[in-house]
């Protein structure tokens, strides 16, 4: 979607609706839906602080749960846990989140689990040295940009998350694409000559960030990396 928007020179799409109501989708039994909604909302208010803490840390609370159950995407899904996973677990993200109030993504959501980081100073790319607001990360971003690529530095995840949002790149897609390229590199399918001097090993933060910027600029190996895994497989197999 980001590529389509860029090519059409579209910055954003704004949708207007008359208003937000509980029966926007013309439910069959509105009273029953409202009753269940009241019950679910009450359970969330009473239990969330003691269990998932979604209102405090959002979906990032899943990091340690997935790691404990050997389900955390690690090194392009080769593993399900890692000894350094605590470096990017929910306690770490709680220390970064600065907006303590619930910040829902939709009007009326009682969970309001979206979080953000204020005044974060960017270190690379076109916004280097500037302080910005970074949305999230949610679990999918923390795991996709983090453990799946062998990255256990929260600051790398935050900066990559910011630039993906800024460039119009899906964090999940980029995390998976990068992990695929990293495994190809470590297995000898890719090398510095093919990547334009980048060493795409698991956990190599500087080169991973540089590749993301090259994708956004449409430069060198970034032109290939930005095409997604399906096309990359074809290119790597042929060449």
Roles of regions detected by a PLM:
Residues 1-239:
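Intrinsically disordered, low-complexity segments enriched in small residues
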């Amino acid at each position: 979607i980001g590529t389509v928007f860029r090519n059409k020179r579209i910055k954003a799409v704004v949708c207007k609706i008359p208003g937000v109501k509980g029966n926007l989708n013309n439910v069959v039994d509105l009273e029953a839906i409202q009753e269940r909604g009241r019950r679910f909302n009450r359970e969330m208010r009473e239990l969330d602080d003691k269990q998932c803490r979604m209102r405090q840390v959002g979906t990032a609370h899943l990091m340690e749960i997935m790691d404990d159950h050997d389900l955390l995407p690690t090194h392009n899904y080769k593993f399900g846990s890692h000894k350094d996973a605590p470096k990017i677990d929910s306690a770490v993200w709680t220390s970064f989140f600065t907006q303590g109030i619930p910040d829902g993504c939709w009007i009326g959501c009682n969970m309001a689990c979206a979080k953000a980081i204020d005044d974060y100073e960017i270190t690379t790319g076109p916004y280097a040295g500037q302080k910005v607001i970074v949305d999230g990360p949610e679990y999918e971003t923390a795991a996709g940009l983090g453990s799946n690529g062998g990255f256990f530095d929260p600051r790398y995840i935050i900066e990559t998350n910011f630039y993906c949002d800024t460039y119009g790149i899906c964090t999940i897609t980029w995390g998976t694409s990068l992990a695929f390229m990293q495994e190809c590199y470590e297995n000898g399918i890719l090398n510095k000559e093919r990547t334009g001097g980048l060493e795409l090993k698991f956990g190599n933060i500087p080169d991973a960030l540089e590749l993301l910027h090259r994708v956004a600029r449409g430069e060198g190996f970034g032109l290939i990396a930005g095409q997604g895994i399906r096309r990359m497989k074809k290119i790597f197999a042929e060449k």
